[in-house]
Swiss-Prot record:
Its biological purpose: Involved in the fragmentation of the mitochondrial network. Involved in perinuclear clustering of the mitochondrial network. Plays a role in removal of ultraviolet C radiation-induced mitochondrial DNA damage. May act, redundantly with fis-2, downstream of mitochondrial fission, before the fission products participate in either mitochondrial homeostasis, mitophagy, or apoptosis.
Molecular function GO labels: lipid binding; molecular adaptor activity
Gene responsible for this protein: fis-1
Organism expressing this protein natively: Caenorhabditis elegans
Protein name: FIS1-related protein fis-1
Cellular compartment(s): Mitochondrion outer membrane; Peroxisome membrane
Pfam family, one: Fis1_TPR_C
CDD domains for this protein: Fis1
Length: 143
């Protein structure tokens, strides 16, 4: 799997509806949160974040906590909260330095940040060039 494709997964609406229909249990809440993180709807991703944060704050189960932190980082990355995502992954990697999933996700998030940052600079540069061209054209028209 291409590292960046980690960020591009999505959940079908049927999966979300099925997860919502399950009885309320810790395991089902985690499953629901995970499918919500894969939603195309930002509100559902945010709902997934809320569920995961509740589970993490209430957990004595380190495995559940690890999974939840991983999906929290993924959710924040999907919402373009890259700094929050990187901070969560760094915290996870401090406790589990050999966690390859977290390492790959951090690499994908950093790559996406870099590309979008460069893209943002390119768009800004293009906008400056257009405005500069309009100013020059306006000055030339005046003469």
């Amino acid at each position: 799997m291409e590292p960046e494709s980690i960020l591009d997964f999505h959940t079908e609406q049927e999966e979300i509806l099925a997860a919502r229909a399950r009885s309320v249990s810790r395991e089902n809440q985690i499953s629901l949160a995970i499918v919500l993180v894969g939603s195309e709807d930002r509100r559902e991703i945010k709902e997934g974040i809320e569920i995961l944060e509740d589970v993490v704050s209430d957990t004595a189960h380190s495995e559940d906590s690890r999974v939840c932190v991983h999906y929290l980082a993924l959710a924040h990355a999907r919402l373009k909260n890259y700094d929050k995502s990187i901070n969560l992954l760094n915290a996870l990697l401090r406790t589990e330095p050999s966690n390859m999933q977290a390492t790959e996700l951090r690499r994908a998030v950093e790559k996406k940040m870099k590309r979008e940052g460069l893209l943002g600079l390119g768009l800004l540069g293009g906008a400056v060039a257009v405005v500069g061209g309009l100013v020059i054209a306006g000055l030339a028209f005046r003469k």
